[in-house]
């Protein structure tokens, strides 16, 4: 990718910063997570949570959601203009769980959004600290990616459930900025664009007038974000076609679906970063760790280190398996929902199983669930090794855009070969190469056909011992190739419902 020089690193996107050197980036990312930690500690004080209750991931999620809701300007404005029954637009809240006489109790709390904003700003040196808010959104998005399936949403937009490995970040709110755009998968961007085009088909005023002009700008910006994720000239040229279309319609939807399919072999570059629950940063700050002084990176050893010595708990339903619950959070913390299970298992040091074999449901507990039978257990979030997070699709060499890894979107920059059955994927490309994008389609199909399963991605990259913080001795794992590496195999997870 020749354009590397013009790109800001994730950390710069994440902190809204201009060009900075590595030390400055580490410091500003440190300032960001330190602010989240200070905010969390303050909220625990406000709510009088015990140490144990403050380490409960459900409480962390409620507190994170409250601050995100307090800063959601668009929704706040909407709520004030459309007062709905029983919703106070100025308040936010959620369930907080407390330990009383050996049992867990649910308490619904309500806070002024203004008060939450004040506490957040106070924890962030008086600033709005949007970067920290985005960071929390990405953690929630990673948790959703690991917990829920999006088959319904895929089918609704005319895509194929087999494209689920392209759906990273599909539940991120639109306001998540550049850092959010970086972690969205190709399928997520395609889906957002298709929804937009469909609205334009059904509502003739969608692209017209002053509003329509703004819509058009948003459409072109989304096209450019998606174009930037593709690594081959033909895919990018096709995106130019979609972007420049006078009035986008079914032809563009066809092109986008074709591109999404092609991304199963010619993978897009999607960023991965380890975003941890607020309570983890809170614990570290409370123990006297100075993130800004020490510096922090979302794509290196730091999150692994932090998780090695953080004790976090989760409420657990009677029939759930605590080890499976831990796996979900571990995957979410490292943004590894779409990673090859062989790679994840090696790094984690315990077997990571496909979602179809997990006996656990989501983390949020519905208000009608019985608390009597609720227990809590420690989440096992430690790892055996650490590895650098990648921002590429795992293509072996950029010159001839070879195959990225199929049915997964690599998270860790670790050498692996590609377990894929090309015939299965090529079957999705029956015929249709006519129309104005025919030459590009032909070229893309040709590249896909020449992709070889025996290719190796991330050549020579390995994992590192946790004592090797400078990443000096890569250990290149060898994998059993007979195993299918996809997490979504035999999927039976719940659908994500907003």
Curated annotation (Swiss-Prot):
A motif (Bipartite nuclear localization signal) lies at residues 198-216. Residues 1-21 are annotated as: Disordered. SUPFAM superfamilies: flu NP-like. Keywords: Capsid protein, Helical capsid protein, Host nucleus, Host-virus interaction, Ribonucleoprotein, RNA-binding, Viral nucleoprotein, Viral penetration into host nucleus, Virion, Virus entry into host cell. The keyword Cell division does not apply. One of its GO terms (cellular component) is ribonucleoprotein complex. One of its GO terms (biological process) is viral penetration into host nucleus. One of its GO terms (molecular function) is structural molecule activity. Late in virus-infected cells, may be cleaved from a 56-kDa protein to a 53-kDa protein by a cellular caspase. This cleavage might be a marker for the onset of apoptosis in infected cells or have a specific function in virus host interaction. InterPro entries: Flu_NP. It is found in: Virion; Host nucleus. Its main location: virion. A motif (Unconventional nuclear localization signal) lies at residues 1-18. Homomultimerizes to form the nucleocapsid. May bind host exportin-1/XPO1. Binds to viral genomic RNA. Protein-RNA contacts are mediated by a combination of electrostatic interactions between positively charged residues and the phosphate backbone and planar interactions between aromatic side chains and bases. Belongs to the influenza viruses nucleoprotein family. Encapsidates the negative strand viral RNA, protecting it from nucleases. The encapsidated genomic RNA is termed the ribonucleoprotein (RNP) and serves as template for transcription and replication. The RNP needs to be localized in the host nucleus to start an infectious cycle, but is too large to diffuse through the nuclear pore complex. NP comprises at least 2 nuclear localization signals that are responsible for the active RNP import into the nucleus through cellular importin alpha/beta pathway. This is Nucleoprotein. It comes from Influenza A virus (strain A/Tern/South Africa/1961 H5N3). The lineage of its organism: Viruses, Riboviria, Orthornavirae, Negarnaviricota, Polyploviricotina.
